[in-house]
Amino acid sequence: MDRDAAHAALRRRLAETHLRAEIYKDQTLQLHREGVSTQDPRFVGAFMAAKAAHLELEARLKSRARLEMMRQRATCVKIRVEEQAARRDFLTAHRRYLDPALGERLDAVDDRLADQEEQLEEAATNASLWGDGDLAEGWMSPADSDLLVMWQLTSAPKVHANGPSRIGSHPTYTPTPTGPPGAPAAPLSRTPPSPAPPTGPATDPASASGFARDYPDGE
């Protein structure tokens, strides 16, 4: 707070000196424009007052400039100090990265990770070969199809000894020319009936073999 008040007082005195120098300078120029002689006490007094205010103003300006330069340099130094402090704090917080052996440890970790990645890739490859394999032909593999067929066979109904489908078993219905009950009727055949075999002597087996001729009485 005292520093701010001192700076405000310096600025106020500088402003007052600048205003006083301008007033005395204008009075001197006004007397000169009016044709007052430089030997006139009025001119001499105004000129000396203006000169004194001018010298004071220059001194205060130079002082203000020096102070401002010092303030700027102090600000630069402060910034540099703050930067160094921040760098020191950062390095202190990460001092483990400053270990000379850190590079070797990082290389060792990279090698170990690479080996583990290769092991994982090999395990994934083996799992793919052992598993379902390529699913381009569908999600069921040949082994899956065989397993499904086995399930179908084992779940099929068994044939009993007296079952209707066993060879030689008695039918469960009365045979009819049209087949079992519920079966569709056989279609009518369009083939003409075969002629009855002739009953003449030419077709008699006994006559043809001469048996009747040799044994006329059937003996």
UniProtKB/Swiss-Prot annotation:
Q: Which residues form a coiled coil?
A: none
Phenotypic consequence of residue 201 to A: In strain: Nonneuroinvasive mutant HF10
Q: Name one GO cellular component term.
A: host cell nucleus
Q: What is the effect of changing residue 178 to M?
A: In strain: Nonneuroinvasive mutant HF10
UniProt main location, coarse: virion
Name the UniProt key words of this record, in alphabetical order: Host cytoplasm, Host nucleus, Phosphoprotein, Virion, Virion tegument
Q: Where in the cell is it found?
A: Virion tegument; Host cytoplasm; Host nucleus
Return the annotated region ranges for Disordered.
161-219
> Posttranslational modification, per the record?
Phosphorylated.
Which pairs of positions does the record mark as disulfide bonds?
none
Pfam (any one): Herpes_UL14
In what ranges is there compositional bias, type Pro residues? 177-200
- Tell me which family the UniProt entry assigns to this protein: Belongs to the alphaherpesvirinae HHV-1 UL14 protein family.
Function statement = Contributes to the nuclear transport of the viral transcriptional activator VP16 during the early phase of infection. Therefore, participates indirectly in the regulation of the immediate-early gene expression. Additionally, seems to be important for efficient nuclear targeting of capsids. The UL51-UL14 complex regulates final viral envelopment for efficient viral replication.
What assembly does the database describe for this protein? Interacts with UL51.
What's the protein called, per UniProt? Tegument protein UL14
Q: Which organism is it from?
A: Human herpesvirus 1 (strain 17) (HHV-1)
Q: Upper lineage ranks?
A: Viruses, Duplodnaviria, Heunggongvirae, Peploviricota, Herviviricetes
